[in-house]
């Protein structure tokens, strides 16, 4: 009996000691959960876009947000200095779910810790994520070192056995918050494992990452200079679509990007000719965002067909053949737009051939299902893209007037020879926008683009026509455009080209006498560039030639991109065909 009491007493003491030990060792975890439950983490306050604030990324990690946390956009978690600090979920403004994983009562996200302009310390300069083994970027980096007989490629090392320090950017001292090996024990040259498959490279804040974005979908394409993929199409358990993550670096030096391309942002709302001719590529009605489905045209029922991918390759091929100086995307870029569609991923996919070739481009609006709220967000994202000319439109629209200039022989001596107009398909607003610009006598190579056709695209009786003209239904859903059509003539615009009607890829001559208008004008269609089961994907090209003094146009088809069709004169000073 006495012996049993002693055993019970020792058991109680051992249990109390075990409870105390467990409490002490778990206190940091308990403190983290209590603080996330009871204390709201501060919001990330920005004046303008994150790219322009001077904030860099101090650290990156994957953390679990539990159901009892007060907020998952901003959480309390431990820094490398063992302080509870605020971490922010990447791409908080995105409507789609950007979680990496989920379980009972928790969801995991990629979080980042900001390094503010008034703070000292090192920043993350490169990132990689892989759930299975070493990320490909790290493996390639080590392979290149070994290939170049760099001894650093064969081993890992640090300044000491227990610590690795990075020098502070503002002084020559080492930053004491970089005790990587002591905390994690895993590092590879300049790369450090941060758990859950994340690898970080740290360096001076001047080289630090400026922004991290998430993209949802199977066919994400990253083509922007200054941006690099952290992970491509990471499969997520319990989710139908993978996630890709990209980040924006501060400098281009670390990128293997074509040095021949002009990566400088266009600072003036104008276009400068580089040679005697100027080509414009019109892309219309892409309808991107379709699901990946089985290909009914193949015998195997499990064969996969991506609706959008052949059309991206089609645009690539046309650009290789034509080398255009400007790309104009005339509307209806989404297929059945809804809030679950990651429009950023779709836009990057459609402009990837354009951006990768360093071609200036612009969008005209033509999304009937998109509400005003989404329109603002979509246009703001479009305006942020490199080489995009829509940034010069200060309103939430796609109205643009871009002078076409000859190269300056001396500073300030550029001569305007033409004008490119883009309209937003609202007839009244388009009229008011165009009316405020005086006609320049020197500007003769003038073209206009928008998504919807004008009423004058339906002439009566016999008329000149070049191309396919299959859709001839009523345009009563469009307000009367006669005054706008006359104004186009008064401004000496030689042609206007639209999209919208997939069955039409022609140019119709709008006869001034027949339609009781002030002049003749070619009214063109770009055709459908996206996938359409009934119609062949096409693009239209306009060429302004200052040596021949004419404007010509033709089309290329996805069926054979090496051939052109329906070559025609739009205007010629010699032939005076207008």
Swiss-Prot record:
> Which Gene Ontology terms of cellular component type are present?
cytoplasm
Protein name (Swiss-Prot/TrEMBL): Protein SIA1
UniProt KW Isomerase keyword: no
Q: Which residues form the signal peptide?
A: 1-28
Instruction: Tell me the domain of life.
Output: Eukaryota
Name the species this protein comes from: Kluyveromyces lactis (strain ATCC 8585 / CBS 2359 / DSM 70799 / NBRC 1267 / NRRL Y-1140 / WM37)
Q: Which UniProt keywords apply?
A: Signal
Query: What task does this protein carry out?
Result: May be involved in the activation of the plasma membrane proton-ATPase by glucose.
Q: Which GO terms describe its molecular function?
A: phosphoprotein phosphatase activity
């Amino acid at each position: 009996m006495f012996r049993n009491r002693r055993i019970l007493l020792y058991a109680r003491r051992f249990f109390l000691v075990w409870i105390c030990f467990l409490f002490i060792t778990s206190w940091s975890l308990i403190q983290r959960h209590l603080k996330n439950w009871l204390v709201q983490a501060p919001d990330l306050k920005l004046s303008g876009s994150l790219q322009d604030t001077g904030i860099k990324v101090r650290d990156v990690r994957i953390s679990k947000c539990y159901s009892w946390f007060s907020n998952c956009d901003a959480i309390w978690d431990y820094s490398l200095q063992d302080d509870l600090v605020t971490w922010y979920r990447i791409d908080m403004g995105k409507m789609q779910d950007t979680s990496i994983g989920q379980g009972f009562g928790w969801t995991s996200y990629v979080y980042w810790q900001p390094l503010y302009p008034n703070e000292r310390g090192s920043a993350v300069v490169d990132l990689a994520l892989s759930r299975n083994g070493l990320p490909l970027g790290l493996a390639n980096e080590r392979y290149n070192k070994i290939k170049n007989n760099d001894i650093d490629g064969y081993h890992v090392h640090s300044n000491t056995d227990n610590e690795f320090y990075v020098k502070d950017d503002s002084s020559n001292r080492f930053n004491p918050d970089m005790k990587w090996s002591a905390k994690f024990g895993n590092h590879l040259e300049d790369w450090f494992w941060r758990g859950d498959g994340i690898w970080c490279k740290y360096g001076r804040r001047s080289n630090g990452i400026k922004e991290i974005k998430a993209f949802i979908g199977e066919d994400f394409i990253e083509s922007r200079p200054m941006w690099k993929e952290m992970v491509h199409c990471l499969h997520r358990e319990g989710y139908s679509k993978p996630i890709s993550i990209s980040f924006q670096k501060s400098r281009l030096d670390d990128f293997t990007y074509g040095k021949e391309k002009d990566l400088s942002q266009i600072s003036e709302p104008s276009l400068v000719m580089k040679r005697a001719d100027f080509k414009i590529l019109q892309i219309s009605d892409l309808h991107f965002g379709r699901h990946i489905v089985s290909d009914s045209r193949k015998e195997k029922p499990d064969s996969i067909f991506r609706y959008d991918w052949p059309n991206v390759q089609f645009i690539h091929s046309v650009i290789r053949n034509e080398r255009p100086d400007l790309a104009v995307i005339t509307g209806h870029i989404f297929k059945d737009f809804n809030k679950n569609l990651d429009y950023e991923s779709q836009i990057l996919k459609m402009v990837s051939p354009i951006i990768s070739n360093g071609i200036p481009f612009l969008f005209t609006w033509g999304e009937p299902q998109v509400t005003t709220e989404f329109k603002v967000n979509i246009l703001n994202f479009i305006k942020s893209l490199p080489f995009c000319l829509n940034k010069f439109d200060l309103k939430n629209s796609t109205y643009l007037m871009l002078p076409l200039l000859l190269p300056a022989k001396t500073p300030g001596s550029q001569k305007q020879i033409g004008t490119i107009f883009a309209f937003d398909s609202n007839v009244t607003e388009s009229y008011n926008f165009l009316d405020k610009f005086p006609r320049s006598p020197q500007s003769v190579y003038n073209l206009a683009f928008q998504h919807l056709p004008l009423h004058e695209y339906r002439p009566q009786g016999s008329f000149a026509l070049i191309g396919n003209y299959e859709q001839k239904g009523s345009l009563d859903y469009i307000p009367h455009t006669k005054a706008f059509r006359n104004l186009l003539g008064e401004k000496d615009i030689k042609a206007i080209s639209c999209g919208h009607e997939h069955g039409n890829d022609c140019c119709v001559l709008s006869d001034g006498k027949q339609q009781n208008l002030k002049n003749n004008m070619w009214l063109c269609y770009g055709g459908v560039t996206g996938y359409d089961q009934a119609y062949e994907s096409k693009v239209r090209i306009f060429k302004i030639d200052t040596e021949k003094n004419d404007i010509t146009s033709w089309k290329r088809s996805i069926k054979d991109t090496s051939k052109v069709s329906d070559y025609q004169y739009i205007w010629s000073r010699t032939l005076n065909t207008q």
